Amino acid sequence: MRIYRVKPIAWTDSSVALLNEYGATLCTPDREATPLDLPEADEKEKSPPTPRLLPPNAAPSKNPRQKHCRDRLARRLEKCENGAEKKTTKEDTFMLILVVNAGSSSLKYQVRDTSLPEAEQMLTSGLVENIGTDVPNHEVAFDIMSERLEPVLAGRELQAVGHRVVQGAEKFTHPTLLTEEVVQQIDDLSPLAPLHNPAHAQGMRAAMHKWPSLPQVAIFDTAFHSTMPEEAWRYAIPYDLADKYSIRRYGFHGTSHEYVSHVAADMLGIARDEFNGIVAHLGNGASVTAVKGGKSVDTSMGYTPLAGLIMGTRSGDIDPSALTTILSREGIDGERLDTILNKESGLLALAGSNDMRKVVEAAQSGDERAQLALDMTSYRLMKYIGGYNLVVGGAQALIFTAGIGENSGDFRKLVLDRLGALGIKYNEEENAKRSPEPRVISTEDSAIKVLVIPTNEEKAIAEATEELVKGL
């Protein structure tokens, strides 16, 4: 029988519970055990008696996972002093999570240590570009990324991978552990997200090939919006067509909307499941979401990310008949029309630039088209905010997030100046400031709190990945 030596320590109920957690066997002098010569403690330390630790089976397991548990147990036992276990340290609880966003031509990544304070969690981030040209495929991209990570990890091992996925449809409404079957199902949803899901699936297969024993989790942008009622997600088209082609409102940016709404609720001292608010995610892609009881009940993007607000290069809402007119009279096909609506419209079409900073500067210099673009964009957002205030039964907060929402006080002012009818009042000095910290910019007497909260989708993905993996 193999006996494991452990350092003589004082044993308490917490120590015994720790051993039971790992399925180990305690042998004290009043239980039968093979004798083991242990160093004698000083007379003052002889009580209580030192137990001896035996493995649960006579023969030691060669299973590396069990060995890991024994080693981890031994380390934690050494931390017991004066009959009590020390508080678990960051070193004991660290979880290194790789967050990836695999696109068709790029691989964005970030490594986070979720045991550290939020400001210190991000260890590194980067981008591998030109996949399909200079970089042959996603497997090579993951190899390049892995080489870059080696000096950062410094011998530590990743413990999980979290993958961002744009479209989960009705199939995936929660973080999901990846298997070959799950990856294929994500790939099968490509008709709903042809620019994203095929690349996500390729990235997942490459990651699973590189780290076959590492838990990998998919986090879906659409999942947060799966709680929308049917009156919000169904389109008024024949049921057979809607069902045949899965045509409905899905919504996007869900990871950001959920994360920011949670931060807002915490800031205001409101239980997350009681929070009613409106989140405006304003970047090159933009969407606004109505949150009621902590859940998404409506959102501006629809079947694709094209619907809703005017964006950097996307048109947002448009009468479908205008599209059939363009198709027939211009003699173009659907693919060309899709390119026009997604890549040649929005601010770019109206003002000649998809960069909000340049559009604001042009408007301030007297450019009438730039001013019109700002007026149209803020007007469209104002309409959604006003409507969603009714949807949630009176918002407790309006939140601005993402690149424009966080950094453009000029655009926030354009929007907020339109919302006086809702009783919204804001502090112009606070609004003009730029800060990486979440903050309230409304006045004390504002009917609705106005917040600016930096989004952190990578943090949200890492936390969701950790939660699922720890439950395995």
Protein language model annotation of sequence segments:
Residues R329-A373:
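A mobile "lid/hinge" subdomain adjacent to the ATP/sugar-phosphate binding pocket shared
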Residues T227-R329:
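Glycine-rich phosphate-binding loop of actin/hexokinase-like ATP-binding domains
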Residues V260-A264, D375-G393:
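Phosphate/ATP-binding catalytic cores across multiple sugar-kinase/actin-like superfamilies
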Residues E78-F94:
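Short, Lys/Arg-enriched N-terminal segments with co-localized hydrophobic residues
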Residues I97-P136:
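Short glycine-rich, Thr/Ser-proximal phosphate-binding strand/loop in the N-terminal lobe
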Residues G409, K413-E457:
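Conserved phosphate-binding/catalytic loops in two-lobed NTP-binding clefts
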Residues L149-N197, P215-V217, A223-Y235:
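Short beta-strand-loop/turn "lid" adjacent to the catalytic site in phosphate-handling enzymes
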